[in-house]
Amino acid sequence: MTFAEELQQILPPDLPHRDAVIASAARHLDLIVETNQHFNLTRIVSPREAAIKHIADSVIPWRLFSGAPHVVDAGSGAGFPGIPLALVLPETRFTLLESTQKKARFIESAAADLGLANVEVRPDRAEDWLKTHRASIVTARAVAPLTRAVGLFAHALRAGARILLYKGPDAEAEIAEAASEAAKRRVHLRVVERYELPDSLGARTIVEIR
């Protein structure tokens, strides 16, 4: 099946702007496949796996981001979760940070191709950019263990941002390991959402640092 057909099957029925999200998310995945011929953006390119692990994983917890004026995706890679969330939440401004220049150029090109006026791409390291900029929410999928993440996002936390990190099924163990670092920095870590990916492709946990 095509990306669009897979997404039609697996995305939640109550997802905002669902049909438009499916069309644009499928186009995003097509662009990744095209670009992967020249340099590696992701190893996940089969329609079913990409639809689940890239798009569904990004948008299932969309309600946590709803109503936030400005969301920062720290280390966006090929545009996840930032681009799918921006499709679902067109009224929210998104800044996608990606320090690898080729990937940043790809995300910028993809956002332009999709007509995402609510997306800005910056070729910067998250920990540097966040020292001088503010955000309502900072999120990331491929991020360091929580022990390090507490320090990486220290400036954003001091500026009042809410940190929402996509984690796997062992988040509680990470939270326990990070307890002393969190106490030292006077922040709190907690699980705010859990969900299962379709096809038994894994359990996911959203951890909040605040």
From Swiss-Prot:
GO terms for cellular component: cytosol. Pfam families: GidB. It comes from the Bacteria. Keywords: Cytoplasm, Methyltransferase, rRNA processing, S-adenosyl-L-methionine, Transferase. Its main location: cytoplasm. It is found in: Cytoplasm. InterPro entries: rRNA_ssu_MeTfrase_G, SAM-dependent_MTases_sf. GO terms for molecular function: rRNA (guanine-N7-)-methyltransferase activity. Its EC number is 2.1.1.-. S-adenosyl-L-methionine binds at G75, F80, E98, S99, T100, A126, E127, R141. Specifically methylates the N7 position of a guanine in 16S rRNA. PANTHER family: S-ADENOSYL-L-METHIONINE-DEPENDENT METHYLTRANSFERASES SUPERFAMILY PROTEIN (PTHR31760:SF0). Belongs to the methyltransferase superfamily. RNA methyltransferase RsmG family. This is Ribosomal RNA small subunit methyltransferase G. It comes from Solibacter usitatus (strain Ellin6076). The gene is rsmG.
